[in-house]
Amino acid sequence: KQAKQMFEQQSIEVKMHLSTFSGELIELAADLTTNDSDVVAVVGGDGSLSEVITGLMQAKSQCRVGLIPAGTGNSMANDLKLKDTEEAISRIVTGNYQLLDLAKVDMVAGLPGNENGELTRYSANLVTWGLGVDSTIKAEKMRWMGPMRYDVGILMAIMANNRRHATLTLDGHPIEDDFTLFLIQNS
């Protein structure tokens, strides 16, 4: 509501869409009708940003995306030096944008959360598999801890020492082994 009021004080039209479950922002963003001059401002954290980008990419939207940090970790906001809501809105209103590379991840059927078929996701921040996912799943069960839950989650995942047999293909070269973690970071 604070962000909406700040935009409206600048005479900027705002349409709000709220999510109620994980993955809903993908659907909401994919269903938006946008043009090149529109900005979709994401009020949330890294997960919300990734969902909105995925939905916009599915819709082949050419609009810009702004991030207003309101998540727990806010890794991307920290990388972009977005201190608070006011800073983020100021950059959006003045057109102060940073071009970012996106990672496109095509996941095969059978992965947790993707048992029924292939799935494509996009990320501007990071993509992780294995330990990173394990720690996030554990952290999500401890939301009451705030940002510290990520530290506790990673410690628990390290202690569990889960390794997975997989084939990673990089530049056409397959690497088959037991892995603890894959991580692609954009910062």
Region annotations inferred by a language model:
Residues 25, 47-52, 75, 100:
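Short glycine/serine/threonine-rich phosphate/pyrophosphate-binding segments
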Residues 1-40, 50, 54-55, 87:
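ATP/NTP phosphate-donor binding region
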Residues 10, 58-184:
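Catalytic core of DAGKc-family lipid kinases
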Residues 41-48, 95-99:
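Short, basic, helix/turn surface patches
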Residues 35, 44-47, 71:
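Generic alpha-helix structural propensity
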Residues 17-19, 42-44, 66-68:
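Structural motif
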Residues 21-22, 45-46, 81, 128:
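Short beta->alpha junction loops/turns
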